[in-house]
Every structure is written in C-alpha cells, then in structure tokens.
C-alpha cells in the first residue's frame, strides 16, 4: 500500500512518516514545501510538493498514484490566518481543492484506482459554548482560520473520493530538531526559569499527543474508514489544569502559575472557550487508544532526554 503524507516537515507529518516507514507492506511518500527536514532519510521516498501549486500537486499525485493521502499540511497559526487571509485561503481551502481535483481526475481515468483521502481538521470549527463534543455537533466558526478549515471539510465531503476527516484538538509533541514550542514545553521552560506565567482557566480542551493523532490517521487508512472522526486526547482539561499537570510532572513551582481570563488576553483571532472531543466512535470503530495527558508528557520528556544525550 502506498500512503502519501503532505506536510511531512511538520509535527504530525514527521510522526506519520516515521510510523509508516516502520510498517511492513507500506510504502510511504513524504511531501512538503522545500527540502526534506527529517533527520531520518531512509525507509520512505521524499518528493517536494507545494500544496498551493496546483500543477505540482497534480504531477506528484500522478507520479505516485497513492492508495491513500493523509493531508496533514495546513496553515495552523490562528492569529496569522486572521491577518494573512490570502495565504490562509491558499493553504486551507485552495490546496484541498487541488488535491481533491487531482485524485478525482486520476480516479476517473482509471476505474480500478480508488484512493482514500484522510483530511485533518480542528475543534476550532465550533463556537465553544459547550463541550466535549461528538461528531454530530453543528460547526459555527469564530475565526478566519476556523472558517477556512470548515470550508476545507466541505470540499472533502462533497468529493467523489473515499474520504475520512480526522478532527483533532491542541496537538503537542516535539519535532526532530525541537525547533517548535508547544504549551507543554512553554510552561516547563518558563517555570524552570522562575518566571510567572498567566494561564487561562476558562478554556477547555482534550489535548492530543502527536503520536496518538498519527496512529488515528493510520487506523483510518487501514480500516478504510469513511466519514468524520474525532481523534484527540481523552483527558478533558482547562488550560490551567493542563499547565498544573506539567508543573506536577516536573516538580515545578505552581505558585508561579497565575489564573487569567481569555478576555484579558489580546489576540487577533477569537478562540472557542470550550471544545474537547468525545472519542467513542474512534475507539469503537478504529481501535483508537490514546495516552492520558500525563502519559503524553512522560513520552515527550523521554524523547527530549534521548535527543539531548545524542
């Protein structure tokens, strides 16, 4: 089976490629804009693909004819999407259309070719009035990012492909070169330095370990799943509770953590106050089994230590 991953230089993309290249019977094609930034270079094929370049998307998909595409690439900086709307549309809407169009055209030309598209989406498509949420909840986006991701979902759902949408929440983990921060590393670093941090207590999420999300996406492919699936962590936490758990794990001073309200933080884009997902469907249909948040912190900590010791 050939599985093509978009956004292979990103957090989820890296986890997907490394998991797929270790599995028998799977040929992984990693794609991203620019050069391959993964440290491990063997076990997969790398093909540059800028998803905003319609011609290149068509060429790469025609060349490889993947059995499944896991579309992990996106513009995910919520505030940047609010201020750079054209770039947001190019990445989160137009690129989805290019992938769908190319796969549909290839499917039409070859009746035996039935590719699957696994598309990543977000809890931010909801307005956050309540949670946790199941797959049947009605979207109501509050930001340009959220609107763009919902439009991407609509393109996938109206396609003639076999498709699955993996909605997820607040993904955390580390990339090869540890160049990207996340809420866990941010809290740890500031508390270790004795800095006071303001953390909102009125936003609730089900934080998702990147490895778990990668496993969920791969299960969607292996099970030939169709439809929308919530693929997130299982612990429903406020952001304040989340940061307290980080402090507990590392034995850091929780008195440095100051509760605050979302209204006190000035950001270009609105965030939904309460999301988080009910993941019963993924557990039942796919055998999805995510880590607890504390287990996720432990795994990340072990990964950081192994990189530092090399």
Regions found by a protein language model. Give the residues of each.
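NAD(P)H-binding glycine-rich loop region in Rossmannoid oxidoreductase-like domains
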Residues: 48-91
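Glycine-rich Rossmann NAD(P)(H)-binding loop
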Residues: 199-204, 229-237, 285
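NAD(P)-cofactor binding segment of oxidoreductase domains
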Residues: 83-118, 155
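Mid/C-terminal beta-alpha module of Rossmann-like enzyme folds, strongest
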Residues: 216, 223-268, 273-274, 308-310
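Active-site "gating" loop of Rossmann-like NAD(P)-dependent oxidoreductase/epimerase domains
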Residues: 75-78, 83, 120-143
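NAD(P)-dependent short-chain dehydrogenase/reductase
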Residues: 154-205, 212
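N-terminal Rossmann NAD(P)H-binding glycine-rich loop of SDR-like oxidoreductase domains
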Residues: 3-23
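Amphipathic terminal alpha-helices
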Residues: 293-310
């Amino acid at each position: 089976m050939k599985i093509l991953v978009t956004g292979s230089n990103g957090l989820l993309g890296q986890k997907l490629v490394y998991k797929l290249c270790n599995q028998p019977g799977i040929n992984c094609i990693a794609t991203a804009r620019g050069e391959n930034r993964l440290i491990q270079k063997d076990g997969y094929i790398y093909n540059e693909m800028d998803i905003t370049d319609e011609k290149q998307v068509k060429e790469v998909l025609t060349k490889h004819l993947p059995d499944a595409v896991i579309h992990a690439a996106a513009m995910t900086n919520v505030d940047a999407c609010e201020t750079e709307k054209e770039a947001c549309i190019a990445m989160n809407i137009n690129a989805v259309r290019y992938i769908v169009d190319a796969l549909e055209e290839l499917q039409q030309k070859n009746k035996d070719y039935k590719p699957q598209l696994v598309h990543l989406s977000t809890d931010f498509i909801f307005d956050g009035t309540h949670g946790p949420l199941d797959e049947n909840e009605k979207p109501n986006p509050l930001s340009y990012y959220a609107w763009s991701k919902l439009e991407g979902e609509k393109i996938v759902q109206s396609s003639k492909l076999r498709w699955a949408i993996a909605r997820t929440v607040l993904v955390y983990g580390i990339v090869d070169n540890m160049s990207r921060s996340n809420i866990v590393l941010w809290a740890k670093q500031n508390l270790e330095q004795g800095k006071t941090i303001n953390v909102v207590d009125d936003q609730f999420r089900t934080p998702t370990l990147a490895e778990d999300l990668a496993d969920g996406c791969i299960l969607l492919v292996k099970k030939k799943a169709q439809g929308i699936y919530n693929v997130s962590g299982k612990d429903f936490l406020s952001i304040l509770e989340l940061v307290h758990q980080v402090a507990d794990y590392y034995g850091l001073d929780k008195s440095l953590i100051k509760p605050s309200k979302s209204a006190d933080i000035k950001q270009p884009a609105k965030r939904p106050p309460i999301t988080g997902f009910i993941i019963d469907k993924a557990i039942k249909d796919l055998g999805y089994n995510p880590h607890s948040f504390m287990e996720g912190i432990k795994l990340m900590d072990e990964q950081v230590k192994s990189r530092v010791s090399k």
